Amino acid sequence: MAISLATAYISPCFTPESSNSASPSRTLSSVRLPSQIRRFGSVQSPSSSTRFAPLTVRAAKKQTFNSFDDLLQNSDKPVLVDFYATWCGPCQLMVPILNEVSETLKDIIAVVKIDTEKYPSLANKYQIEALPTFILFKDGKLWDRFEGALPANQLVERIENSLQVKQ
């Protein structure tokens, strides 16, 4: 399995078909996965009223690693991993926030996004039961873990406090 690391400038990818109706997913901070999904990694397709544009990464540093463990062990800085799914509303709301956080902390952390549908074995290994789930790794080891969407300033504060970084 090849894992790509991309940092900074992740384009928004959630596009509601109708902008008139308020989406209930916009008020959620995380999505709980049914046990069938956690166990088998299969997911029902989203409703026809929601469309998702593909994630695109612009102006990013891209590296390829043989495995996720290789990525964690060989990173020269802590790695914030965003476990997400394309159908998850709160995950899509985090895209511009992660872009901002990645830019703000570009000298301190690397940001990696892992699609739980494409890599269910990683989701199972790290017991991902809600989306989005963020795991901060330092020196290849799990350092901090939290679930749910956060505003950029709270996410930066959480990361800095966890790493004990003062700007």
UniProtKB/Swiss-Prot annotation:
<feature type="site" description="Contributes to redox potential value">
    <location>
        <position position="89"/>
    </location>
</feature>
<dbReference type="GO" id="GO:0009507">
    <property type="term" value="C:chloroplast"/>
</dbReference>
<feature type="transit peptide" description="Chloroplast">
    <location>
        <begin position="1"/>
        <end position="58"/>
    </location>
</feature>
<dbReference type="Pfam" id="PF00085">
    <property type="entry name" value="Thioredoxin"/>
</dbReference>
<feature type="domain" description="Thioredoxin">
    <location>
        <begin position="59"/>
        <end position="164"/>
    </location>
</feature>
<keyword id="KW-0150">Chloroplast</keyword>
<keyword id="KW-0249">Electron transport</keyword>
<feature type="active site" description="Nucleophile">
    <location>
        <position position="88"/>
    </location>
</feature>
<keyword id="KW-0809">Transit peptide</keyword>
<dbReference type="InterPro" id="IPR005746">
    <property type="entry name" value="Thioredoxin"/>
</dbReference>
<dbReference type="GO" id="GO:0015035">
    <property type="term" value="F:protein-disulfide reductase activity"/>
</dbReference>
<keyword id="KW-1015">Disulfide bond</keyword>
<dbReference type="GO" id="GO:0005634">
    <property type="term" value="C:nucleus"/>
</dbReference>
<feature type="site" description="Deprotonates C-terminal active site Cys">
    <location>
        <position position="82"/>
    </location>
</feature>
<feature type="disulfide bond" description="Redox-active">
    <location>
        <begin position="88"/>
        <end position="91"/>
    </location>
</feature>
<dbReference type="GO" id="GO:0043085">
    <property type="term" value="P:positive regulation of catalytic activity"/>
</dbReference>
<comment type="similarity">
    <text>Belongs to the thioredoxin family. Plant Y-type subfamily.</text>
</comment>
<dbReference type="InterPro" id="IPR013766">
    <property type="entry name" value="Thioredoxin_domain"/>
</dbReference>
<feature type="active site" description="Nucleophile">
    <location>
        <position position="91"/>
    </location>
</feature>
<protein>
    <recommendedName>
        <fullName>Thioredoxin Y2, chloroplastic</fullName>
    </recommendedName>
</protein>
<dbReference type="InterPro" id="IPR036249">
    <property type="entry name" value="Thioredoxin-like_sf"/>
</dbReference>
<dbReference type="GO" id="GO:0009416">
    <property type="term" value="P:response to light stimulus"/>
</dbReference>
<feature type="site" description="Contributes to redox potential value">
    <location>
        <position position="90"/>
    </location>
</feature>
<dbReference type="InterPro" id="IPR017937">
    <property type="entry name" value="Thioredoxin_CS"/>
</dbReference>
<comment type="function">
    <text>Thiol-disulfide oxidoreductase that poorly activates chloroplastic malate dehydrogenase (NADP-MDH) and fructose-1,6-bisphosphatase. Provides reducing equivalents for peroxiredoxin Q.</text>
</comment>
<dbReference type="GO" id="GO:0008047">
    <property type="term" value="F:enzyme activator activity"/>
</dbReference>
<keyword id="KW-0934">Plastid</keyword>
<keyword id="KW-0813">Transport</keyword>
<dbReference type="GO" id="GO:0009570">
    <property type="term" value="C:chloroplast stroma"/>
</dbReference>
<keyword id="KW-0676">Redox-active center</keyword>
